[in-house]
Amino acid sequence: MAVTFYDLSSEAGLEKLDEYLLSRSYISGYQASKDDLAVHAALAKPPSSKYVNVSRWYNHVEALLRISGVSAEGCGVTVEGSSVATPPVADTKASAAEDDDDDDVDLFGEETEEEKKASEERAAAVKASGKKKESGKSSVLLDVKPWDDETDMTKLEEAVRSIKMDGLLWGASKLVAVGYGIKKLQIMLTIVDDLVSVDDLVEDYLTAEPANEYIQSCDIVAFNKI
């Protein structure tokens, strides 16, 4: 179902978008799509931190564009009062190639005291209104390290993505050189906090049989509530 937003250059437009994203990670569906690119392109500049949900979503889309691009079609979105130009997928992939040499990727940024306070106030408002609060979600950036330079990284990533469980969604990934011909897999994932424990995911699945044929160890690079 198509979504329409109005004049995202105005405070009223940003407030509506912020309210819309209060209970959503993306504009439509459960992964970034061209709908997110359309709304992202309609914003002339990064949103103020007072729009907590818009800022969180904007930073997440920026990170995806840096490392892999967005290709999902989405459900359709219209932004009235703005000139929207959705970036082509090829351009985002080119940008990702330029960033392949970066070992450290700051996907989420630090949450400010102002953002924390605003989040708490919104949660209190939802509770006071009698609405059922959705289970929290988190975005995680994981480093997955192979045994040596002879490890087949394609099979390593296949082993990672073969792990399925309720509340777990694998996202964008890239290979990052660490030296001596060895590369590590850097991969994003979204989890439902009540259903998935990252520690259990690493210990019981990623570094256990059969995945440990390719995976030596895993490190949590970034963990952000969304």
Curated annotation (Swiss-Prot):
Annotated spans, Disordered: 82-131
CDD domains: EF1B
An annotated Gene Ontology molecular function: translation elongation factor activity
Ranges of biased composition (kind: Acidic residues): 97-113
Keyword Iron-sulfur part of the UniProt annotation: no
Alphabetic keyword roster: Elongation factor, Protein biosynthesis
Family: Belongs to the EF-1-beta/EF-1-delta family.
Organism (species): Spuriopimpinella brachycarpa (Chamnamul)
Subunit structure: EF-1 is composed of 4 subunits: alpha, beta (1B-alpha=beta'), delta (1B-beta), and gamma (1B-gamma).
This protein's record includes keyword Protein biosynthesis: yes
Annotated protein name in UniProt: Elongation factor 1-delta
UniProt-listed InterPro entries: eEF-1beta-like_sf, EF1B_bsu/dsu, EF1B_bsu/dsu_GNE, Glutathione-S-Trfase_C_sf, Transl_elong_EF1B/ribsomal_bS6, Transl_elong_EF1B_B/D_CS
Known function: EF-1-beta and EF-1-beta' stimulate the exchange of GDP bound to EF-1-alpha to GTP.
